[in-house]
Amino acid sequence: MDYGGVLTDGAAMLALPGRARAAGLPTALVSDGNEVPDAVCRLFDVVVLGAQIGARKPDPDVFRRVAAMLDVPPQECVMVDDLARNVRGARAAGMVAVQHHDVDVTVCEVGILLDLPPV
């Protein structure tokens, strides 16, 4: 999941990682930015900021490496980002990717994809 443009879009978006974790799913925050509030970072199992792993989004290798950090095959990952180029990069890595435009739509789509209980 991305920070800027996604998690900054309100409480319902910020609740998604917690809902996923409550369902037993590992979570990751991947941001090209270098700073994310600690309170947001604590919502995730893995946090990758900037070029910490030697590449940046939309490079598919970023998404593959993060999936490996989660010990989850890329094809079992759902990535959410507001930028089409990053969605394409995640898809090229084999992930299901959701382009965020609208909070209600994204929360619904991710909930369905991850089989999360309704809120």
What are these regions (language model features)?
Residues 13-21:
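Short amphipathic alpha-helical segments and helix-helix/interface helices
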Residues 1, 14, 25, 30, ...:
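Asp-based, Mg2+/Mn2+-dependent phosphohydrolase catalytic module
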Residues 1-10:
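Asp-based phosphoryl-transfer active-site loop
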